[in-house]
Amino acid sequence: MTQLIKKFSVIIILFLLPFSIYAQTESHQLSTHILDISKGEPAQGVDITLYKLNPSTPSQWKQIATGKTDINGRISNFLPSIEDNTGIYMLKFYTEPYFLKQGLKSIYPFVEVIFRIEGKKHYHIPITMSANGYSTYRGN
């Protein structure tokens, strides 16, 4: 009987595991990453700050969150999905320290990407960059 309970428990865990992983990745509405195109690798250890534009005072930005890119150059946990996140946001990527660590001078001390969030869809706002250029797009 004990053996049967153990097998049943393992089956239940294996069945529920994919749902818990999906729930964790979808619990945040905004993610980002940086790809260093000069190396073809993720940019690890870059500080990023998220701001939201104050709708009543359009010249003021409110800091919402900060993070540092992981080994894959990603931050996946900006903006919890349980809130209404409609608004205009800015991701500020502090890229200069990343390039200085590699012995490179960058023309961009930081990169600011401004975008709008509407509804409950997930937004992935990555940048691809080198010390002398960058590009952005809405990913998924």
Q: What does each of the following model-derived ranges do?
A:
Residues 1-10:
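Bacterial N-terminal signal peptides that target proteins for export
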Residues 13-44, 52, 134-140:
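Beta-strand-rich domain onsets/edges
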Residues 23, 86-140:
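Feature of secretome-associated and extracellular-like proteins
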Residues 38, 54-56, 97:
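Solvent-exposed strand-loop boundary residues in beta-sheet-rich modules
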Residues 44-48, 89:
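Short beta-strand/loop motifs in extracellular/secreted proteins, especially
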Residues 47-64:
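Short amphipathic beta-strand segments in non-cytosolic proteins
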Residues 69-80:
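Glycine-centered loop-to-beta-strand initiation motif
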Residues 81-85:
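Short, surface-exposed loop/turn segments at beta-strand-coil junctions that are enriched for proline
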